[in-house]
């Protein structure tokens, strides 16, 4: 009991209170944020002034929220996209295959047509338009010979009805008719089998 106030006096435990405060402070010092501690370990090359510029720890980056990009924190880009399967590539329709078949069919038809034209030089490469022109000229030549045979050797040549085109085409047809007339008058014998085509006709056609 205290002699001053007459009340019982409880001694103050200064030593124990100081120990409790020191323990609490020590525990707070040891409880460092795990992100800051890991950041210090992973960035040893940074100087102390740069520590204040480091990004603060935010819980939203550790919750794995969707739509967040973690690539600037060392994460794998695109890791947040879940359920994304391989992209399916749609195949194009079979139009390309049909086009290749059509082209092959046309080329085969032109190759067969070139074989039907006689006296073609071996080193001569004919285009499609040249093949068609030579084929029509050869057909006109054969029809002219057949027509002259029916007319008992008359020299009048067969004239096919063509639409009028430009002056160059008309001149070519006129020259062809003149060549056919001259070749028919010089050769009176009736040929047997496949009829040949005179070489000067080839020379005239290749000049075009």
UniProtKB/Swiss-Prot annotation:
Matching InterPro entries? bHLH_dom, E-box_TF_Regulators, HLH_DNA-bd_sf
- Signal peptide (UniProt feature, chain positions): none
Q: Where in the cell is it found?
A: Nucleus
Q: Record's superkingdom?
A: Eukaryota
Q: Does the keyword Transcription regulation apply?
A: yes
Q: Where is this region: Disordered?
A: 79-106, 161-197
| MF GO annotations | DNA-binding transcription factor activity, RNA polymerase II-specific; protein dimerization activity; RNA polymerase II transcription regulatory region sequence-specific DNA binding
* Bias kind Basic and acidic residues: ranges: 161-178
Q: Supply the Pfam families for this chain.
A: HLH
Domain bHLH residues, every copy:
90-142
- Amino acid composition bias (Basic residues), ranges on this chain: 88-103
GO BP field? cardiac muscle cell differentiation; cardioblast differentiation; cardiocyte differentiation; cardiogenic plate morphogenesis; determination of intestine left/right asymmetry; embryonic heart tube formation; embryonic pectoral fin morphogenesis; embryonic viscerocranium morphogenesis
Q: What is one GO cellular-component annotation here?
A: nucleus
- Keyword Nucleus recorded: yes
Q: Which UniProt keywords apply?
A: Developmental protein, DNA-binding, Nucleus, Transcription, Transcription regulation
Q: What does this protein do?
A: Essential for myocardial and pectoral fin differentiation, patterning and morphogenesis.
Quaternary structure, from the entry? Efficient DNA binding requires dimerization with another bHLH protein.
Q: What is this protein called?
A: Heart- and neural crest derivatives-expressed protein 2
């Amino acid at each position: 009991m205290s002699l001053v106030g007459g009340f019982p006096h409880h001694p103050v435990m200064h030593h124990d209170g100081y120990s409790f405060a020191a323990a609490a402070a020590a525990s707070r010092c040891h409880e460092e944020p795990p992100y800051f501690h890991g950041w210090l370990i992973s960035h040893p090359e940074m100087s102390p002034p740069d520590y204040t510029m480091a990004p603060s720890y935010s819980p939203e980056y550790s919750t794995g929220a969707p739509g967040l990009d973690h690539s600037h924190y060392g994460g794998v880009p695109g890791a947040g996209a879940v359920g994304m399967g391989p992209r399916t590539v749609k195949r194009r329709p079979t139009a390309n295959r049909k086009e290749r078949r059509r082209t092959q069919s046309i080329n085969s038809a032109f190759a067969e047509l070139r074989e039907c034209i006689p006296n073609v030089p071996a080193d001569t490469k004919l285009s499609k338009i040249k093949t068609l022109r030579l084929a029509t000229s050869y057909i006109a030549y054969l029809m002219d010979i057949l027509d002259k045979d029916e007319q008992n050797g008359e020299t009048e040549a067969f004239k096919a009805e063509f639409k009028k085109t430009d002056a160059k085409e008309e001149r070519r047809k006129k020259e062809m008719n003149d060549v056919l007339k001259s070749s028919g008058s010089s050769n009176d014998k009736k040929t047997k089998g496949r009829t040949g085509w005179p070489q000067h006709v080839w020379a005239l056609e290749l000049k075009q």
